[in-house]
Every structure is written in structure tokens, then in C-alpha cells.
């Protein structure tokens, strides 16, 4: 199984620009695709935690990267992630950069993101995307049974540059190119599950159901905010995914005979 997370990806950019995003376009043509609406607060840390635990935000209780002025750690999340339930002796699983906490979570892969994974500098974000692409391809060359990776760069770019449509679109082109490389390791004629998704969409401030971040932050003015409508693309996934946690439930069902 291959699971690719693209933090903050939105159909509002992808669909109008399909002709410039050939790999997103191919996924839309050859896979099932739709909007996944996040009914709970569309913040990255709790949503990715739901995706990778199979639990709702209420069930896992993880609210944000920082709670009561304290940076959260893995030990602060009172829940098991799917890779912790799956037996490593039975399933070769490699997990890269799940942004439930900082630093992001990895499993059976050694990796350190550029700038501790929190940079908003465009050059560093570009370096970070390329580094994660290279590590992902290195891991995929090994042919793991379960591979998951999350790319965070679109979220950072969107927050600070949402008012610059061409710049944001250029970063979607970069992400599309990364997808093309990763999908070289997926056989579209096989019965292997493939999931590509985001944790939330993106929009101007005030367009989403709830405001997740203020417009003014210590890092600068934010030009956009999270939207509850996320991207969901699946192939060979015979499971009714209505909420983020359903992704984790599907993963656990798929490997139910290999749980530890």
C-alpha cells in the first residue's frame, strides 16, 4: 500500500489547472476522487493523527502542535498509530514525516527535515521538498509493503503567499512533479491500494467554517487559512471513507492479519 499525504492540497487549485498538473490529472482519471469534508476542526496535527490512528479527534484527544504553551511530543498523544499496531515482523512498513507533532513522526526510516520541519523560507521549503522526494524514492526502491509519506510544503507556502496565485500554482506544479516520481513505483494495473489525500483544503481568511490561525502571527501575516474541504484520491480501496479516521481504519483492516 502507498499512502501519500499532501498537506493543504485543495481541489480549488487542482481542478482548474489539471492541464498543468499531469500527475494529479492522471490520478483523477484512473482513480476514485472526491472531497473529504473534515467535520471536526481542520487543523493539521489532530487531522493527521486521526488519519494515522483511525480515531476521531474526540477519541485521540490530540488538539494541536502546541497546547498550553507546550510543544507536544509523541508521548503526549494517548493513542496508537497504525504502524504501532501492525507487526513489523510481518509487514515491511516505512513511514515518513507524519506531522502529528514536531519533529514529524518517522517509522523504520531515519530522516531529518530541513529547518526542523517548521521553516517558511521558500528556498528551504524547496530544499525540504527535494530532500523528502529523494528519501521517498530511496525507500520505495526497497519495495516496502506499506509506505506512507506526508509533504507539508504546500501548507507553508499557502499560508504566507495565498494572495499570489501564480506562486502557489508553481508549488502545485512542484508537488505534481514529485507525485509523478513516486507513482513510478505504483502499478496502476495491480490490486495494491493507493491513497493520496490532504488533511484540509485552503482558502482566504473567513471562507472556511472555522478560523484555525490568526491573520497576524510572530512569523508574519498569514494570507490564507485552512478550509474543511480536503482532497481524497483512492484506488483499490473498498472502504467507505467519510471522515479522516476512516483512512486509518482501512489501513488496519487491510493488515488485520498482521496486527501485533
Could you tell me what each predicted segment is?
Residues 1-260:
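Feature captures the catalytic ectodomains and active-site-proximal regions of enzymes
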